[in-house]
Amino acid sequence: MKLSDKTLTLLKNFSSINQSILFKEGSSLRTISVMKNILAEATIEEELPRDFGIYDLNQFLNGLNLHQNAELDFENNSYVMIREGKTKSKYFFADPSVIVTPPDKSIVLPTEDVSFTLETKELDKLLKAAAIYQLPDLSVIGEAGVVRLVVRDKKNDTSNDFSIVVGETEGEFGFNFKVENIKIIPGSYEVVISSKLLSRFKNTGFDVTYYIAMEPDSTFN
């Protein structure tokens, strides 16, 4: 079998959440960060023929790049054979017990208290601003009738910040994320936030959804 560019893009992103991954037979991909504060799940076009673990996903993907059009053979229980023309690589599976894996049960938000659409350009600008100004926090703030996304240093009242209005609200709230936890592929997202400090980012172009925990100092009135 071959992996599509779309699947490779997802796997590269998943490697930033957790360097290891346990693939499951079928077309579902799921991963969770070692700290268990980011969970991602996606559906891919390929049907994986077996369960197998990869300890260093980034290394595995870089190995695939040694081939222009790699064919993956999963006949062996211990490794995958990567072939193209006269070249081939043998890549051994990892013991599943050494991989931090998501719970089998699907994630359901306990409540759905705030929702908005985050467009591609808005996400890009927020993350660029956070990098330029070296800001560690992303806050979803509801006040004065609008929902704003703000990158800032919430511990420093005199820090630079950058904000974008993404919707309207009648509520007052301040949900805080660590910018380093916004490990999502570029694109537009339907975002839903629970006051129980869990959020869902559903990509509108890829079949991928992220569940990201918020900081305990978040507020919701």
Show where each model-derived region lies.
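DNA polymerase processivity clamps
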Residues: M1-F93, E112-N221
